[in-house]
């Protein structure tokens, strides 16, 4: 599962913006 982490506030996951 990829999370949208633009600000980097997703449990340390680096997803696509």
Swiss-Prot record:
Keyword field: Acetylcholine receptor inhibiting toxin, Amidation, Disulfide bond, Neurotoxin, Oxidation, Postsynaptic neurotoxin, Secreted, Toxin
Protein name per Swiss-Prot or TrEMBL: Alpha-conotoxin-like Sm1.4
Stated role: Alpha-conotoxins act on postsynaptic membranes, they bind to the nicotinic acetylcholine receptors (nAChR) and thus inhibit them.
GO MF entries: acetylcholine receptor inhibitor activity; toxin activity
Keyword Disulfide bond assigned: yes
Biological classification of the source: Eukaryota, Metazoa, Spiralia, Lophotrochozoa, Mollusca
Cysteine pairs bridged by disulfides in the record: 5-10, 6-17
Cysteine amide modification, residue list: 17
Domain statement: The cysteine framework is I (CC-C-C). Alpha3/5 pattern.
List of residues that carry Methionine sulfoxide: 2
Organism of origin: Conus stercusmuscarum
